[in-house]
Amino acid sequence: DTNYKCLLWIDTLNDKPDIVSEIVGIEPSRKQIKGAHMGGKKPPEAIWKINTWEFVSPTRYAQNLWLLQESFEDVLNMMDRREKEFIAIAKKYDNINFQLQSTTYLTPVSFKLDTDVLYKLKKYHGYVCFSIWTWIN
């Protein structure tokens, strides 16, 4: 089985990622802080260039495209429960990204999301990108 998940990440520019948690009342799955050291590398490569607040959908073991859609819906449903707060974040930073991650190179980049999901992405000024999932939380 291929392991799929949706990662929501918000670039908080020069603010610490904790500000998102304070506004939306949800702790991130992970946060990256500008200037944080990446083990084993020497500066300047060791420095993150952006601050990010990241939330990962529950893992899906998908054998069909429908489960990929569900991973987006997991994240969007979480956001909808705090809609006003996430819209405020979207306006503040204008950089909310939804990243579909896959453990294999079979990620269908032409995958089409349902209209209602696309509408919700638009509401949050969201962008969708695809990548290979190379780490385990």
Regions flagged by a language model, labelled:
Residues D1-N137:
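Acidic (Asp/Glu-rich) sequence patches and key acidic residues
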